Amino acid sequence: MLKQQFQASLPLLLALSPLASAMTLYEGADTEFAAKVQGAAGLFHSRESYGQTGVREPGSVNWQEATLQYGIEFKHRSAGLGQVFGALDWVSSASFGDGDAAGWSVGDERTTKIENAYLGWRNDSLEISGGRQNVVVGDGFLISGDALNIGRGLLDGEVNRGGAYYLTGRKAFDQTAILRWGCQQSWRGDLMWLKSDNLAQASPELSVVTLEHVADAGTVGLTAIKVTDTDQALAQILYPERKGMKLYSVRAQGNAGVSDLFLAGEHAWERKPGGADENAWYLEAGWTFSQLPGKPSVNYRYSRFSEGYDPLFYGNGRALGTWFQGEVASNYAGPFNSNTRVHHLGVKAAVSGRVNVGALYYDFATLNRSLGNRDARELDLYAEWTIDEHWSLLPLVGYYKPERSAEDGGSQLGTAKGSVYGQVLLVFGF
């Protein structure tokens, strides 16, 4: 029985930068068609490997990944009748070289599949949509797309999604029906049915309800989720208590009326069908020194995830490290937002109008070491270079130091010495 939860991170610039603007193909008084082309390529190196899938040996690995997304979007406005919108696009993805440091991918995965295929209608206070599309709730603590892209390394390739494990070109839920109501300010909410075709997630179906109050000082939100079905054969191996699970959360994020202040927090309660209760929560505070050159910012966050907590579809939402905590830990070594408490400190500043630099520090402490010891510390240094409106570059260097090797209850193969990790991502959008 595989009890560990695993995920992979979105490249920061694809998730956060505005460079992926579509190219207009036709624009009339009421109708617009646009072409969407965006992608990423990455070079990766890890001095050490991690024993998650049984296909890795101790030592260094080098690999490459690439994704390309391409398709069309449209909007049609009718006076007094709202707007019809939709999209159809594909994603091609590939992994090369050794495959990633944990063996989720082995380096020979290639595939092209439909990514988004949805249709919807909206007016000023209501939106209805359905089809295959990405969904994010809050800042991604619970749901940030269906973005787990396992390759052929796990379960003899049974859950292969086509490679590019880190770049996660595939984020859309396979089937959705979504009703959104409310405005940008005051009360708003969502009613959603989501169906995943991701075998590494055991293909769950989810019913989701959210309620938020949005104001200038911040947003307060409630979320309720029920997992109504799973692929039972895979769920018995990966998530035996996922079907029937209920999850409730309360969250808040804002500046409390102080422009340089950042405050955020969320608490999630999870009830497993067998009666077990799990939980996860975090508190975060940050400050931007807006009067200083480069407007440096500093953030501290404490998060805790109980030993049996199922993190569902978490992912990077508002920033690098939220919620993939540590480039090595979140992608390859664990603890994957379960059975851990984490201290996190992040700093970031602008070197110029096109270049930002930052540092992310993490201290991981395992709650129940009988399930595996993922105690570790990690430091990641990164830069974001916006080359122009279409191209960006993200280099990152990380240092990861576990307390235990895999042979002593950890996950790093062969040694508990510190490991150096490096990556360079090239991201583009037209």
Model-based region annotation:
Residues 207-292:
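Surface-exposed beta-loop-beta
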